[in-house]
């Protein structure tokens, strides 16, 4: 949506508020709480996930940080998939979503939530090493945030097609027009043109992998 994109740009330009992850605590959260937060604060909304963690503020340490009354308690959410056993016997999890509350940059937030997930999974499902993989949207990021967390590049994914109303509004993954009943009404002539929609492509994504317990 327009307001979300504008808030993301403001944060990228250093115009948003800051919250320090050291002033927050990590808690597991439920499906509904994660979905509500991600629908409001992630460009692609929520996604199916098995593990969901939230970052909750409990204090502010002053200069350079948003006041406690200027943000809600839940300021960031990370969601991870169910583990999948690889051919070598290790488990692989996907980091499906990460988002901070609109207009706020959480300094150290990605690392705090990732560490919580890794600690939660260590020694479970499959003993020994496991991996966390994710995709970086090249429209917004170049992967450096993930590299700082220890992720390594593992290839590129081609651009993805979306349908978008010409008068604005949220873009819809092209595949959802046929697979998601919420959007089937847009398919009047098989292309979405009946609803004045245009086909656009993003710039693709970068695959990254973090190897844990090695």
Regions found by a protein language model. Give the residues of each.
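Extended, hydrophobic interaction surfaces within ordered domains
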Residues: 1-10
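A polyampholytic, Gly/Pro-enriched intrinsically disordered region
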Residues: 11-18, 181-185
């Amino acid at each position: 949506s327009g307001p979300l994109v504008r808030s993301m740009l403001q944060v990228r330009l250093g115009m948003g508020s800051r919250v320090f992850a050291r002033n927050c605590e990590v808690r597991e959260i439920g499906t509904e709480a994660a979905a509500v937060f991600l629908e409001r604060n992630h460009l692609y909304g929520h996604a199916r996930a098995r593990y969901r963690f939230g970052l909750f503020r409990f204090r502010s340490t002053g200069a350079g940080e948003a006041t406690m009354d200027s943000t809600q308690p839940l300021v960031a959410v990370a969601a991870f998939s169910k583990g999948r056993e690889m051919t070598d016997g290790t488990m692989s999890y996907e980091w499906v979503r990460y988002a901070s509350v609109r207009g706020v940059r959480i300094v150290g937030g990605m690392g705090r939530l990732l560490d919580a997930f890794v600690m939660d999974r260590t020694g479970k499902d499959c003993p020994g090493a496991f991996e966390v993989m994710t995709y970086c949207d090249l429209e917004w990021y170049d992967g450096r945030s993930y590299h700082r967390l220890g992720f390594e590049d593992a290839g590129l994914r081609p651009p993805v097609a979306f349908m978008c109303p010409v008068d604005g509004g949220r873009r819809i993954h092209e595949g959802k027009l046929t697979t998601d009943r919420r959007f089937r009404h847009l398919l009047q002539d098989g292309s979405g043109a009946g609803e004045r929609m245009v086909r656009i492509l993003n710039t693709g994504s970068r695959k990254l992998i973090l190897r844990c317990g090695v």
